[in-house]
Amino acid sequence: MKCLVTGGNVKVLGKAVHSLSRIGDELYLEPLEDGLSLRTVNSSRSAYACFLFAPLFFQQYQAATPGQDLLRCKILMKSFLSVFRSLAMLEKTVEKCCISLNGRSSRLVVQLHCKFGVRKTHNLSFQDCESLQAVFDPASCPHMLRAPARVLGEAVLPFSPALAEVTLGIGRGRRVILRSYHEEEADSTAKAMVTEMCLGEEDFQQLQAQEGVAITFCLKEFRGLLSFAESANLNLSIHFDAPGRPAIFTIKDSLLDGHFVLATLSDTDSHSQDLGSPERHQPVPQLQAHSTPHPDDFANDDIDSYMIAMETTIGNEGSRVLPSISLSPGPQPPKSPGPHSEEEDEAEPSTVPGTPPPKKFRSLFFGSILAPVRSPQGPSPVLAEDSEGEG
């Protein structure tokens, strides 16, 4: 086998290798009559990827010499990735790339012809192997989305790089929703922030899916395919079925085809039933346990409803000690105690009978302005001696 890649196609080949490196540790290289096939699969057999470069992609392509059988080989991904490690270098200095496969020496030779007559030769050892092929049929999937890779790439940009899985579903109004997925038994601190992105139907070239369907798959492999498709300015098609069935991601061009098959989780029903509705995250049952206001009462945005909502959101924290923050008002002129003020102080506790939660948080958060502050540190120090007139 011998092929020659020139011009900008060298960088395209390098980007494809980078995308495959996100999935597997071994690269299966197979010359075919239809083109050069690069495939990989992860160790758990839950992700499979394949790129098929047509003969027109190469300036020169020969699958096998006359009278010789087609060779199939398997090499380490790190070894082949080291040839295309720097994409910037490929674009600026490499003019053409020659790949040859010699079965007698068991070597895969990759030559990079750079500017100023510089040549870099990589001799990679390989192993003979059988053909790696996954069984899948995109036409059998009832749901399909097609959109420019740039649109989907911008949609996954806000998600954390440490996020493992993402949920893709169809919400109300036929909106396509991407939401971060966290396992139920995971630490509560990891679920503190949920990222969700919504795309309108007009952003897709084709949207053939029912409302309420959703699948959850690995985000790392999905980003690898998006990175390649976006750099090549290609459209991405997503074919999927029910949760638990594999999802198929395809890109197609006159010079290359790409297929990524990713496993999906089978327990996403509880996460997708209210996809796109933020009301499911509000602690409404806890609020009704303390008071049963009219549904329109919270539209007034008064201080009592605000403090009730605060009480329900942090009520589960128990007896955790809150940090003390000094918010005492500035110096005020002393007021002489009078009978009128004493009557007001005695009448003040009776103004909120039967509403312990609001009274509790009023004294906790707003006690410095709504109630007299009683310092537990004892009497304040005497700053001036008593006058002689007072006995």
Swiss-Prot record:
GO terms for molecular function: 3'-5' exonuclease activity; double-stranded DNA 3'-5' DNA exonuclease activity; enzyme binding; histone deacetylase binding; protein kinase binding; SH3 domain binding. Residues 268-282 have a biased composition (Basic and acidic residues). It catalyses: Exonucleolytic cleavage in the 3'- to 5'-direction to yield nucleoside 5'-phosphates. Changing residue 387 to A: Complete loss of phosphorylation and no loss of interaction with the 9-1-1 complex. Abolished phosphorylation by CK2, preventing interaction with TOPBP1. InterPro entries: DNA_clamp_sf (IPR046938), Rad9 (IPR026584), Rad9/Ddc1 (IPR007268). The modification Phosphoserine is found at residues 272, 277, 328, 341, 375, 380, 387. SUPFAM superfamilies: DNA clamp (SSF55979). The modification Phosphotyrosine is found at residue 28. GO terms for cellular component: checkpoint clamp complex; cytoplasm; nucleoplasm; nucleus. Its main location: nucleus. It is found in: Nucleus. Coiled coil: none annotated. Pfam families: Rad9. GO terms for biological process: cellular response to ionizing radiation; DNA damage checkpoint signaling; DNA damage response; DNA repair; DNA replication checkpoint signaling; intrinsic apoptotic signaling pathway in response to DNA damage; mitotic intra-S DNA damage checkpoint signaling; positive regulation of intrinsic apoptotic signaling pathway in response to DNA damage. Component of the 9-1-1 cell-cycle checkpoint response complex that plays a major role in DNA repair. The 9-1-1 complex is recruited to DNA lesion upon damage by the RAD17-replication factor C (RFC) clamp loader complex. Acts then as a sliding clamp platform on DNA for several proteins involved in long-patch base excision repair (LP-BER). Component of the toroidal 9-1-1 (RAD9-RAD1-HUS1) complex, composed of RAD9A, RAD1 and HUS1. The 9-1-1 complex associates with LIG1, POLB, FEN1, RAD17, HDAC1, RPA1 and RPA2. The 9-1-1 complex associates with the RAD17-RFC complex. RAD9A interacts with BCL2L1, FEN1, RAD9B, ABL1, RPA1, ATAD5 and RPA2. Interacts with DNAJC7. Interacts (when phosphorylated) with TOPBP1. This is Cell cycle checkpoint control protein RAD9A. It comes from Homo sapiens (Human).
